[in-house]
């Protein structure tokens, strides 16, 4: 049965408008995004199939172009729309992070870093530069590496921090392996960076390791 023939309260779009997006199941959310189904399947059925195909809603949203466009009911236009939605989410989180104090709203910083780093297939080292009020000046990806490591040069980080006239920084890198435990090299690097930046009166407030959906804080774990 086509969705248009369902009772009004059961139709995903009408349900969203009346009860809010949080009231929808994952399959119903995907159905609203898709708008239409395929032969023999409603948009909700198709949404359910796509979630199962990719292993979850998050995995569907993060699927690459080739994999997404091979899936029934998606195609280039839907993939482009999905990428636009994801980029809107990233920019919204960036605005939230930049609007607040990084110390009083650490969740916004953590969520943003998790969003930009979690799906990288190689190690990336990022720096969040903060002013004297702990507000975000800039976020920069400074180094890229391989699946298991990246080379980080303290001198370059100090140069960028001085260029931004930063008073403090938050460091972040990802572990594509999915293991968020800091290695001895991670701890040693954090210590060296904190010492190098302290020489120019710049504080390192935290260092996050992003591993899949998890984010480990050096400050919270007592490593900083």
From Swiss-Prot:
A motif (JAMM motif) lies at residues 173-186. It comes from the Bacteria. One of its GO terms (molecular function) is metallopeptidase activity. Zn(2+) binds at residues 173, 175, 186. Gene3D superfamilies: Cytidine Deaminase, domain 2. GO terms for biological process: proteolysis. Pfam families: RadC (PF04002), UPF0758_N (PF20582). Residues 102-224 form the MPN domain. Keywords: Hydrolase, Metal-binding, Metalloprotease, Protease, Zinc. Belongs to the UPF0758 family. NCBIfam families: PRK00024.1, radc. This is UPF0758 protein Tbd_2588. It comes from Thiobacillus denitrificans (strain ATCC 25259 / T1).
């Amino acid at each position: 049965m086509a969705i248009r023939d369902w009772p009004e309260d059961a139709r995903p779009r009408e349900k969203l408008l009346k009860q809010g997006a949080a009231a929808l199941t994952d399959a119903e959310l995907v159905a609203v995004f898709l708008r239409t189904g395929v032969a023999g399947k409603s948009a909700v059925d198709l949404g359910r199939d796509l979630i199962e195909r990719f292993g979850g809603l998050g995995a569907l949203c993060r699927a690459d172009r080739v994999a997404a466009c091979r899936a029934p009911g998606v195609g280039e236009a839907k993939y482009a729309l999905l990428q636009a939605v994801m980029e809107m989410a990233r920019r919204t989180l960036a605005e939230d992070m930049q609007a607040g104090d990084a110390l009083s709203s650490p969740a916004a910083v953590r969520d943003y870093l998790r969003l930009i780093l979690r799906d990288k297939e190689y190690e990336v080292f990022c720096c969040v530069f903060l002013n004297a009020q702990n507000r975000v000046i800039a976020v920069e990806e400074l180094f890229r590496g391989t699946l298991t490591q990246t080379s980080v040069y303290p001198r370059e980080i100090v140069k960028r921090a001085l260029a931004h006239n930063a008073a403090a920084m938050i460091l972040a890198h990802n572990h594509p392996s999915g293991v968020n435990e800091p290695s001895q090299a991670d701890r040693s690097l954090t210590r060296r960076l904190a010492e190098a930046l302290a020489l120019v009166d710049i504080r390192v407030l935290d260092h996050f390791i992003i591993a899949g959906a998890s984010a480990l804080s050096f400050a919270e774990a007592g490593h900083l």
